[in-house]
């Protein structure tokens, strides 16, 4: 539908890379990132993150894709700049830290004011409208992402929906950019105002957090009364209104998105009477307390933590639920050792990192893991996990 466009992705994390590679099948894409190591890997057709499809596409597909640390080179000729920088939740202000997004917007406005900026970073409700008014510009479109870490490119190739936070001809053209690189056909597309698009992202993730919290609470109840959690979940989820998905018990919801998005939604609507959303946050804390108490009932001298990552197939442990378990166990004076091959150094959270898996298994009285692995099959009698379905 288009000629070849020049598209820059700012931020080479899983959101930026999955969008950049999607579009590099048909257009000229430059990935901008401040980390030279990431840029060097990408220019060598290697992925800096763990994502099977990203690794495969970089190494085997014909892509018009390169990376740079030079923002002037990245932005100066771009038709579109996709902003995918991190917006961590700031507990002090009860808001997302949007400074990285704002910095990109200012840089692009200075270097290439004609570029259309597409914000993929998760932002507070009302952010896009406010910054457009504040800077006196109109070339910003918010389009939320619904990607899983470790499967980000797959989710862009097979999207559940495409949401564009603007109702205009240029919004329709943007939707086509996301569609033309996808494998899935007949993708639902919804055009909304920017504020509604921002709310869609936060409410979607908050619902997922609620679902995780519900099945975790079901599991806590079942474990407390000696019931078979799996049988209960199977029976509940045969109801098509409930569905057999996102129902595997865990140590709590975690990862990069669900904790911060739920808290941001609470902050956005703190003036609105609510019980459910605040209860989700409380339920997640309660789950971690429950898991910790179950572990401590075994009276271990040494608790071994197998992997910090939140999901299998991911290389990220930001806000992983097991971190909260570690803190609680250590507060009780119990020694914790950790096996996490992704971390360099000798300690994490002031707990020793054990490099050799066999030695780790031998030292631990009980091994806890959020998600099971075949590596633990030989010591399954001392493993504690609530992973019933072997999925995320």
Curated annotation (Swiss-Prot):
Source organism phylogeny: Bacteria, Pseudomonadati, Pseudomonadota, Gammaproteobacteria, Enterobacterales
Enzyme class: oxidoreductase
SUPFAM superfamilies: 6-phosphogluconate dehydrogenase C-terminal domain-like, NAD(P)-binding Rossmann-fold domains, UDP-glucose/GDP-mannose dehydrogenase C-terminal domain
Gene this protein is translated from: kfiD
Annotated binding of substrate, by residue: 145-149, 201, 205, 246-250, 254, 311
InterPro entries xrefs: 6-PGluconate_DH-like_C_sf, 6PGD_dom2, NAD(P)-bd_dom_sf, UDP-Glc/GDP-Man, UDP-Glc/GDP-Man_DH_C, UDP-Glc/GDP-Man_DH_C_sf, UDP-Glc/GDP-Man_DH_dimer, UDP-Glc/GDP-Man_DH_N
Protein family according to the UniProt entry: Belongs to the UDP-glucose/GDP-mannose dehydrogenase family.
Keywords, alphabetical: Capsule biogenesis/degradation, NAD, Oxidoreductase, Phosphoprotein
Reactions this protein catalyses: UDP-alpha-D-glucose + 2 NAD(+) + H2O = UDP-alpha-D-glucuronate + 2 NADH + 3 H(+)
Binding site residues for NAD(+): 6-23, 33, 38, 87, 122, 149, 256, 260, 318
Name of the protein this chain belongs to: UDP-glucose 6-dehydrogenase
């Amino acid at each position: 539908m288009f000629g070849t466009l020049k598209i820059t992705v700012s931020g080479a994390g899983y959101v930026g890379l999955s969008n950049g590679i999607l579009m590099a099948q048909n257009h000229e894409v430059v990935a901008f990132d401040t980390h030279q190591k990431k840029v060097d890997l990408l220019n060598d057709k290697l992925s800096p993150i763990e994502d099977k499809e990203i690794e495969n596409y970089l190494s085997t597909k014909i892509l018009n894709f390169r990376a740079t640390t030079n923002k002037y080179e990245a932005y100066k000729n771009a038709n579109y700049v996709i902003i995918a920088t991190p917006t961590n939740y700031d507990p002090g202000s009860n808001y997302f830290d949007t400074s990285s997004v704002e910095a990109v917007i200012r840089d692009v406005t200075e270097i290439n004011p004609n570029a259309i900026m597409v914000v993929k970073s998760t932002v507070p409700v009302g952010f896009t409208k406010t910054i457009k008014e504040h800077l006196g510009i109109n070339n910003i479109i918010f389009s939320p992402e619904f990607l899983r870490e470790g499967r980000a490119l797959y989710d862009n190739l097979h999207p559940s929906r495409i949401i564009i936070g603007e109702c205009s001809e240029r919004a329709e053209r943007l939707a086509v950019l996301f569609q033309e690189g996808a494998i899935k056909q007949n993708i639902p597309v919804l055009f909304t105002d920017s504020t509604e698009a921002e709310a869609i992202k936060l409410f979607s993730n908050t619902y997922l957090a609620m679902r995780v919290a519900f099945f975790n609470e079901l599991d806590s109840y079942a474990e407390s009364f000696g019931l078979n959690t799996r049988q209960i979940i199977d029976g509940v989820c045969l109801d098509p209104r409930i569905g057999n998905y996102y129902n595997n018990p865990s140590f709590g919801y975690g990862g990069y998105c669900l904790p911060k998005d739920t808290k941001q939604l609470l902050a956005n609507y703190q003036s609105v009477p609510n019980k459910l959303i605040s209860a989700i946050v409380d339920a997640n804390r309660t789950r971690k307390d429950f898991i910790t108490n179950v572990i401590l009932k075994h009276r271990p001298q040494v608790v071994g933590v197998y992997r910090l990552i939140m999901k299998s197939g991911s290389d990220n442990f930001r806000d992983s639920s097991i971190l909260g378990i570690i803190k609680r166990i250590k507060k009780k004076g119990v020694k914790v050792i950790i096996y996490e091959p992704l971390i360099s150094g000798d300690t994490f959270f002031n707990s020793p990192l054990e490099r050799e898996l066999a030695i780790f298994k031998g030292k631990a009285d009980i091994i806890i893991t959020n998600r099971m692995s075949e590596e633990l099959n030989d010591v399954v009698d001392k493993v504690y996990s609530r992973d019933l379905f072997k999925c995320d």
